[in-house]
Amino acid sequence: MGQKSNPIGLRLGIVGTWDSLWYAGGGYASKLHEDLLLRSFVKKTFHHAAVSRVVIARKVDAVIINIHSARPGVIIGKKGTDIDRVKQKIAQMVNHDVELHIVEVKKPDLKAALIAENIAQQLEKRVSFRRAMKRGVQNCLKLGARGVKVSCSGRLGGAEIARTEWYKEGSVPLHTFRANIDYSCAEAKTIYGIVGVKVWVYVGDSRTGGE
């Protein structure tokens, strides 16, 4: 069933860890809902800052948010004004003290979330889906990925009937638990309707230090 399950969720505890690092004895549902709202808020606020991951941890009286971004300067703003404003808004949302940490993504072309967003943006600008997929895959392989797979689903090129197109280079072993596979999806809102973009990136095995 490796083909049908989310590669990240399937490997939690083997390769990688959770995006929500906290334990709740009670009120779990409200905290989980709060996490979903915070992630959505951060990604909408910094949609132009290439945010690949938002990790949320909790103390008794504080919420710690680590934002992984390829453009940390865009988030921080001039003299930290932008990040301070966002910090205040989040503090009002959660009624707790908030710590915001920015983690720079040094190789954005290796992150599935950023590749998917980039392809979706190109599709919205009417770039050919084949060209967008091929460019994303080749840029990723140049940075050392061992395999990349991309799929686009919808009314591709304005076709009457929706279909799914795939582009793959290298190997993406979805059934191997030790394989470090990054996965993400994005939506392109085109004039013909929504096109779904999915990206799998295989960087290496965890036992060989693949990151």
Curated annotation (Swiss-Prot):
In alphabetical order, the GO MF annotations are:
mRNA binding; rRNA binding; structural constituent of ribosome
| Gene Ontology biological-process entries | translation
Gene Ontology annotations for the cellular component aspect, listed alphabetically: cytosolic small ribosomal subunit
Q: Which UniProt keywords apply?
A: Ribonucleoprotein, Ribosomal protein, RNA-binding, rRNA-binding
Q: Which Gene3D superfamilies match?
A: 3.30.300.20, Ribosomal protein S3, C-terminal domain
Q: Which ranges form a coiled coil?
A: none
Q: List residues of the KH type-2 domain.
A: 38-106
Q: Which PROSITE patterns match?
A: KH_TYPE_2, RIBOSOMAL_S3
Which Pfam families does the entry link to? KH_2 (PF07650), Ribosomal_S3_C (PF00189)
Instruction: List, alphabetically, the SUPFAM superfamilies matched.
Output: Prokaryotic type KH domain (KH-domain type II), Ribosomal protein S3 C-terminal domain
Which PANTHER family does this UniProt record tie to the protein? 30S/40S RIBOSOMAL PROTEIN S3 (PTHR11760), SMALL RIBOSOMAL SUBUNIT PROTEIN US3C (PTHR11760:SF19)
Assigned protein family: Belongs to the universal ribosomal protein uS3 family.
Tell me how this protein assembles.
Part of the 30S ribosomal subunit. Forms a tight complex with proteins S10 and S14.
Its function, per the record, reads: Binds the lower part of the 30S subunit head. Binds mRNA in the 70S ribosome, positioning it for translation.
What is this protein's name?
Answer: Small ribosomal subunit protein uS3
